[in-house]
């Protein structure tokens, strides 16, 4: 059986993305996307997303809180120890394609 790990999200940025750089000077950003649930008990899920390199720079330059965003990526789980030595785990979407999901706002950037 083949394995498949593909995620497609359409939602809104929960806050402005911020560009950081790794120790090797690789651009990266993490942000949350608010996505409405389907079904009777509708609610909102906040999905953590990571973008690297050109995608990270693109998102930080042209997207801001509240903007609609379309994301394609894959789910990644990672573990680490926090400063107190506790084991921590995160599940996030690593984006490989990010696009605008609504027309340009007045006064917004032209891309």
Positions of PLM-derived features:
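Single-stranded nucleic acid-binding surfaces, predominantly the OB-fold ssDNA-binding core
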Residues: 1-111
């Amino acid at each position: 059986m083949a394995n498949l790990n593909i995620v497609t999200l359409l939602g809104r940025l929960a806050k402005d993305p911020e560009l950081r750089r790794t120790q090797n000077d690789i651009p990266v950003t993490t942000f949350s996307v608010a996505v409405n649930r389907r079904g009777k008990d509708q609610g909102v899920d906040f999905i953590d997303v990571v973008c690297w390199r050109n995608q990270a720079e693109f998102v930080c330059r042209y997207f801001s809180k509240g903007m609609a965003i379309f994301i394609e990526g894959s789910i990644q789980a990672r573990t680490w120890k926090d400063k107190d030595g506790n084991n921590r785990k995160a599940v996030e979407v690593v984006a490989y394609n990010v696009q605008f999901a609504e027309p340009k706002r007045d006064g917004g950037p032209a891309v």
